[in-house]
Amino acid sequence: MSYNCCSGNFSSRSCGDYLRYPASSRGFSYPSNLVYSTDLCSPSTCQLGSSLYRGCQEICWEPTSCQTSYVESSPCQTSCYRPRTSLLCSPCKTTYSGSLGFGSSSCRSLGYGSRSCYSVGCGSSGVRSLGYGSCGFPSLGYGSGFCRPTYLASRSCQSPCYRPAYGSTFCRSTC
């Protein structure tokens, strides 16, 4: 089964913990092992390899100028980033600056190499190390390490915290 969780050049959908964006665009290089497609997203079960993840969320990526991000549905959060410079572009509700970079409204720093992730609107929280391949979750290339602190069985909500390319760190809630 293939997933339908992406749309647009700089407006990319994510499904579960996996961020989707183009391999390259406007002269900027992105990790080529992250999946990108132009399909429209629907809040259904999506597949990446042999793993299934529920819930879709939109994150806006624009290397030169930030687009306006918006909350797609009540429990879910969206953010806008400049991935090359790791600058949070707004309009996130709350932001912080931690030891590993900039983050969105669902993250708090617990010191170097760790984050406490709070799934705003879902009521879950958790703490995991951000080391490469730790937490038993896959480590993608270019310094990406994925962690999923908490999953609520009552709702399809997760609070993944991960370090993408270029050493930046941010967390988001996915519902």
Curated annotation (Swiss-Prot):
The protein's assembly and partners: Interacts with hair keratins.
PANTHER family in alphabetical order: KERATIN ASSOCIATED PROTEIN 3-3-RELATED, KERATIN-ASSOCIATED PROTEIN 26-1
Start and stop residues of the Sequence repeats: 46-55, 56-65, 66-75, 76-85, 92-101
Signal peptide range in chain numbering: none
InterPro entries: Keratin_matx, KRTAP_PMG
Region span, 5 X 10 AA approximate repeats: 46-101
A GO cellular-component term linked to this record: keratin filament
Superkingdom classification of source: Eukaryota
One Pfam family per UniProt: PMG
Function in brief: In the hair cortex, hair keratin intermediate filaments are embedded in an interfilamentous matrix, consisting of hair keratin-associated proteins (KRTAP), which are essential for the formation of a rigid and resistant hair shaft through their extensive disulfide bond cross-linking with abundant cysteine residues of hair keratins. The matrix proteins include the high-sulfur and high-glycine-tyrosine keratins.
Record-stated family: Belongs to the PMG family.
Gene: KRTAP13-2
GO MF, one example: structural molecule activity
Name of protein: Keratin-associated protein 13-2
Record's keyword terms, sorted: Keratin, Repeat
